Each structure stands twice: as structure tokens, then as C-alpha cells.
Amino acid sequence: MLNIAIAVFIGGGLGSVLRWLISYRLNSLFPHFATGTLVANCIGAFIIAFGIAWFSKAPNIDPIWKIMLTTGFCGGLTTFSTFSVEVVALFNEGRIGWALGTMGANLAGSFLMTAFAFWLLREM
């Protein structure tokens, strides 16, 4: 059990740092749109889908790597809570169009990246 907690801790730390770097670099490009959150969520959706599909095809890989990648890394990288706060803040500021656009972009982007990852691994 301790080794699983350590794996989640390491993966989560790495994913969180990557999310911070992405947001740090991208959020200043478009002040009215949280580009960093969108990119982090889409990358995370791709990685977790690709990882789950990959691990299902490679049963000999130690399951600790799966938990480190999915729960740890992708859990640290993706952020539903930040996405929610950003959307509610936009609604509270009266920027309804931006709020709806942010919701649509995050949901559609994440679903599309998930589907793309599954398709890509199937084609490999």
C-alpha cells in the first residue's frame, strides 16, 4: 500500500508541476480565457486514455506504473476544480459567452483528445 501511495505522490507532483508550467506560460496569452487549464485538461485526457488503452494491451507491465500515470500524473495535471472556478468567475463577471465557450472548449477538447488517443492506439 505504501508503494502505491508513493507512486501516486510522485506522479501527482510531476503532473502538478507540469500543469503550473502550462498555465504560467499560456494564461497570459489570452487574459479572458484560461488557455492553460484547457491545454492541461486536453493533454491529460489524451495521456490517461492512451495509458489505459496501452496498459490493457500490455498486461505484464507492473500495475504501479498505471496508478502512477493515471491517478498520480493525470490527476495532478488535469483540473476540474480550477476549470469550475474559472467558469463560475466568468459567469459572475457577466461574461456569459466566455463562460459557455470555456465550458464547451474544455468538455469537447477533453472528449476529442480521449477519443483520439483510443483511435491512435488502435491504429498502431
Swiss-Prot record:
The chain crosses the membrane at residues 2-22, 35-55, 71-91, 100-120. It is found in: Cell inner membrane. Keywords: Cell inner membrane, Cell membrane, Ion channel, Ion transport, Membrane, Metal-binding, Sodium, Transmembrane, Transmembrane helix, Transport. Na(+) binds at G75, T78. It is a multi-pass membrane protein. GO terms for molecular function: fluoride channel activity; metal ion binding. It comes from the Bacteria. One of its GO terms (biological process) is cellular detoxification of fluoride. Na(+) is not transported, but it plays an essential structural role and its presence is essential for fluoride channel function. It catalyses: fluoride(in) = fluoride(out). It holds the Pfam family CRCB. One of its GO terms (cellular component) is plasma membrane. HAMAP family: FluC. Belongs to the fluoride channel Fluc/FEX (TC 1.A.43) family. Fluoride-specific ion channel. Important for reducing fluoride concentration in the cell, thus reducing its toxicity. This is Fluoride-specific ion channel FluC. The lineage of its organism: Bacteria, Pseudomonadati, Pseudomonadota, Gammaproteobacteria, Enterobacterales. The gene is fluC.
